[in-house]
């Protein structure tokens, strides 16, 4: 497996990983969860059950991201944080509908902070797109307004939107982080 890193001079530096080294690299992957995120024990329980490292950190935006712990033998001489990934998790369609109705527009400001981030994911827990279309949520916002709001913001911000069952949320967060790592180092 090869790794491409861009040096300050714009020159690509290429490293090759054996399967064993790649597994070691994955053992240095740490899921970061925002210190401002309400603790989601089901996500942390999943990560713990799979022996996936995680830690709480104040993130600039979003709820989850990842880092690679220092591993000089694999080319990571210090902890490396991946600012090109932002995962925002919502508990339900009701929560995101409520975010669009808020007068203080915190959610829209957060989305604006995400515009310069390469990989942005919005994960909505336990509901589905059908719940949006059918109006199966608690909010003053009708289903057509919510759908249009989501589509407009998705187009402007360029984020990926997934509906994920609660029991699969930890796995989804890990797989997104791993995929981002793979696409960063295995180009």
Question: In which residue ranges do the predicted regions lie?
Answer:
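Non-catalytic C-terminal interaction segments of nucleic acid-processing enzymes
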Residues: 1-82, 94-187
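Conserved catalytic cores of phosphodiester-cleaving nucleases, focusing on short active-site segments
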Residues: 83-91
């Amino acid at each position: 497996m090869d790794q491409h890193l861009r040096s300050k001079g714009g020159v690509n530096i290429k490293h090759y990983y054996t399967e064993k080294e790649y597994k070691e690299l994955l053992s240095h992957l740490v899921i970061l969860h925002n210190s401002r995120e309400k603790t989601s024990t089901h996500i942390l329980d999943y990560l713990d059950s799979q022996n996936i490292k995680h830690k709480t950190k104040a993130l600039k935006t979003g709820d989850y991201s990842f880092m690679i712990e220092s591993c000089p033998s694999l080319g990571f001489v210090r902890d490396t944080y991946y600012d090109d990934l932002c995962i925002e998790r919502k508990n339900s369609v009701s929560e995101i509908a409520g975010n669009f109705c808020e007068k203080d527009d915190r959610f829209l400001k957060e989305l604006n902070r995400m515009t310069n981030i390469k990989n942005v994911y919005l994960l909505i827990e336990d509901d589905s797109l059908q719940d949006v279309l059918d109006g199966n949520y608690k909010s003053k916002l009708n289903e057509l307004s919510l759908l249009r709001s989501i589509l407009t913001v998705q187009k402007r911000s360029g984020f990926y939107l997934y509906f994920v069952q609660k029991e699969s949320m930890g796995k989804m967060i890990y797989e997104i982080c791993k995929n981002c790592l793979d696409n960063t180092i295995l180009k």
